Amino acid sequence: MTTSSPPQAVTTLTESIKNLLESNFCHVVVKGELSNVSLQPSGHLYFGIKDSRSFLNGAFFHFKSKYFDRRPKDGDSVIIHGKLTVYAPRGQYQIVAHALVYAGEGDLLQKFEETKKRLAAEGYFALEKKQTLPNIPQSIGVITSPTGAVIQDILRVLSRRCYQYKILIYPVTVQGATAAKEISRAIEEMNKENLADVLILARGGGSIEDLWAFNEEIVVKAIDASSIPIISAIGHETDYTLCDFAADVRAPTPSAAAEIVCQSSEQQIQVFKSYLRYLNAHSQQLLSGKIKQIQQWKRYLDHVDFFRSAHQSLDYLCLSVERSIQTKLSQYKQRYMQYARWLQSDVLQRMTYRLHDLWKMIVQAFHNRLTAAKHLCMQKKKNLTFHNTQQFIQKLDLWKQQLHRALTQRLGYCSQSLTHQQTLLKHFTIKLNQQFTKGKHTLNLLQKRLTRTFANTVDEHRENYVRSRENLIFSLHHLVERNREKYYTLSKQLTLLNPKNVFKRGYAMLFDFNENFAIISAKSLHKHSCVRVRLQDGEATLTVTDIQNFETQES
């Protein structure tokens, strides 16, 4: 009697065969001709691949979302990357594809990889060369075809998401023998004239031959030499060109590039509101810590009232000083005018005229008396005899001498009186001039003192005002700088935590090959199982050969 293994269910046997195939053929590359191609509305592609002797069924799940630019057809020569598995309901093995390359594209892919490695070694893809995009660009340059749907998508997104912008379109050919030269010349011209704050290099989807102009070295070098940040938006999300690695930012689609380059208006408003709330909160916190000092300065720094009160007090002080100066000047001016009018009056002239008239009256009186006496003498002479003539002459001479002495004495008195009056007038004039000079000097000293006091008072108030204003401005600037530094720190932290930037630092993410969920624990892995690893610039399929549990090692 022979012993035999226990019977197995069909499902169990099929699962065993499936596990064996998937563990040993987790990544295969098959070349052949497509047959029985069927693209379902769900986006899945079912096909057969054959050569002259064999036939293999296959499936490409979510094919339409990855390769919607070109639809495969029967008879196409292709190269398929995927894994072998078993379709249990029919009990047939098949290939589940995750990449499809048309025949003839293989040489281009090899050239793509060789050029990529060489340019990366020369530093054209270095992360430290990447430029930061402006937050709110005023001018946006777009290098693309002017007649395609790409430019319409970009304009539609910008008009919906931005308040105001200026867009410059540089028309180029995006496919063909001259496309690479036109694209590089467009980048150079935009930089030479400094026409934009940011550039979008855009093209719609296509095959690798259609997109090959963006893999040329001349375009990569033009992007590397650009001083204007460049966003690469070539093809679809699954399409990669060398321009994507050389550009400062890669966008999966042209519409996404427009969204990246210009935040939406609502987002900008929300960001500004959040910044405003943040600044208000920290301003209140800072001001509350200095409430005692502010209370001491409250009477001086009570918002605008302090400055108005200070200006009003300063104006009153200026007005008071000006009135005082005007009053003193008016008083001294009146006294000066009185002295001037008195000096310019005809008092002295009238006194001279009066003395002259008095002198004329005296002379006329003596002349009249002398004439009368002479007249009388002539009459006496006629009446006198000769013997009395000698006696009369002697007597007349005596009268003449007496009259002359009296006249001389009176003239002396008048002359002395006139001299005395002139001396008094001279002394009075000198004294008046001295008092006027002294008053003028006193007025000048008072004016200088008032001017100096006024200037010192004004300077003191101005210094207090400027000092208080500078203190407030310094406090506000200090507060704004602190908040700006905190904003930059948070922005850098946010950039560092961005998953795309994490990929750029050398990290990767593992996904289950079938279920498409992230693997975060070594316990979820099995030997000989296939996993997909996502890197910065693409994906790869790996086979698990060994598992080490860190917790087991620590224990």
Curated annotation (Swiss-Prot):
Ribosomal protein is among the record's keywords: no
Disulphide bridges, residue numbers: none
Annotated catalysed reactions: Exonucleolytic cleavage in either 5'- to 3'- or 3'- to 5'-direction to yield nucleoside 5'-phosphates
GO MF entry, a single one: exodeoxyribonuclease VII activity
The keyword Cytoplasm is assigned to this record: yes
EC number: 3.1.11.6
Protein keywords: Cytoplasm, Exonuclease, Hydrolase, Nuclease
Highest taxon of source: Bacteria
Subunit text: Heterooligomer composed of large and small subunits.
Annotated function: Bidirectionally degrades single-stranded DNA into large acid-insoluble oligonucleotides, which are then degraded further into small acid-soluble oligonucleotides.
Protein name: Exodeoxyribonuclease 7 large subunit
